[in-house]
C-alpha cells in the first residue's frame, strides 16, 4: 500500500508573511522542480535564460541553492522526514523541494537568517498552489532551525569532512562553473543507453574486485579528510555525506573505507574552477582586471581561479582561455603526446579535448564525431576557427566507415560520471547499479570501433570520468580479448613526453607516475588532485 500523501498540517499559516519571494529562490525552486520531474539537467537549466537573466548576486545564490540542495538532498530528506507527523508520508514534489530549499539554507548557509529561509519557504509553498501545506512547511522548518543552528550543524558536519571554506565558495562565483563548464565525455551519464546485441555483457552484481590493493598508498595520504571517523560503517558514511548507500559500499570495497570517505567528502564541495590558457599573456590581462589566479597543480597551461569573474573577461570572450578541469586537460595532453597526422575524436563534444589536439598537432587533420544533434551544433561552432583542418561530423562513431585510417583515436566515452559528483551532484540521484551494464555495453562498442579505425602501429586513448572498474579496466580487458593484435602500453612514456615539452613539471610527473596501475593506466581520484575523477589508458595496434 502506498504511503499517505502529506500535504499539510490542517492549520493555516501565519498571516504576516511577505508576499514577495526573492528571484534567486524562485529560480532555484523552478530548476529543482524540473530536475525532480526528470524534465532536464541542472547544468542545462542553470545556463538557461531564467537564471542567466538574474543579477550576478541572485545568479550566484540561485546556483548555490540548486547545487547545494542536490549535493545534500539525501541527508536533507532524512532530516525532514524525522520531523513530519507521518515520517513515511509521500510529499508532493513542490512541497518536497520547498522543504529541501529551506532546510539547506538553515543548515548550510549561515549568512542567511533562519527566519528569512522559513518565511520565503512558506511563501513558495503558497505560490506553488499548496496554501494549506504552508503551515506544515513553517512547523517543520521551525523545528529544524531550533534543533540545529547553522554553527552547530557545520560543527557536526566537520567530523565528516565538510569544511566551512568549501561551503563559502557556494556564494562566490559559483555560477561561473555552472553556466560555462560543459560536461566532458560525450555527455556523461545517459540512463537511456540500451545494450547492444553485438557486445557481451560485462557487469554482474558483485563481479568487481578490490582495486585498493593495486592503488598506491599515495592516495590514502592525499584523500583522507580531517576528522575521519574509522568506526563508521559505509551506510553511516553514505547518510552523513548524502551519497547513495550502494555506491559508498562499492567504493569502500574497491578503494578502502578511508578513500571512500574522501571521495564522498569531495563530492560535497564546490570543485576548483580551472582554466586552460591558450595564450599565456591572457593571465596578465586577467590579473590587471582583478581576477586572481594560481598555477595549476600539474600542467603549465592550467590555472585555478581564486577570485573574480573569468567568464565576463575579454580574454574569455575572445577565446584566449576556456574553462576546463585540469584532469580533462591532462587526458587531451596525454593523447596529443602521440605524434599523429590523422586524428579521430570519437565522442568530441563539447570540444575541449579536440581543441587541445588541434593546438598540439598543427599539421594534423582531425575528425570530430558527435552523435547528439544538440551537442553537435555547439561543437561545430566551437571548432569553426580551424577551418577544413578539423571536420565535424554528426555521426555515431561505431558506424564510421574509415577502418585503419587514423594514427590516433581519442575515445573519451560517455560514462556514469561518478568521478564528477561534486560538479554534477544530481548523478547520484539518477544512477542505479543496473545502469552500469548499459553504459559498459556502449563503451565497449565505442572502444572496439576506435580500435578498428586506427591504422597498424597507431594508438587509441580510452578515457572516462568514472570511478567504476566496469567502465574502465573491465571494458579495456574485454576489448583486448576481442583484438589480439592490440596491446596496452604504459602512459609513463606520455608523462615523460609532457615533461620534456615543458607542459608538465617534475613534481607533477612524479605524482602521476605514482598513480599508474600495473598495466600503465592512469586513475585520478578526486582529492588526490584538485580534479574530477578520471581513468585513462593507452592501447596500440601492432604494426604489420
Give residue ranges: language-model regions.
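S-adenosylmethionine
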Residues: 1-176, 180-182, 189-544
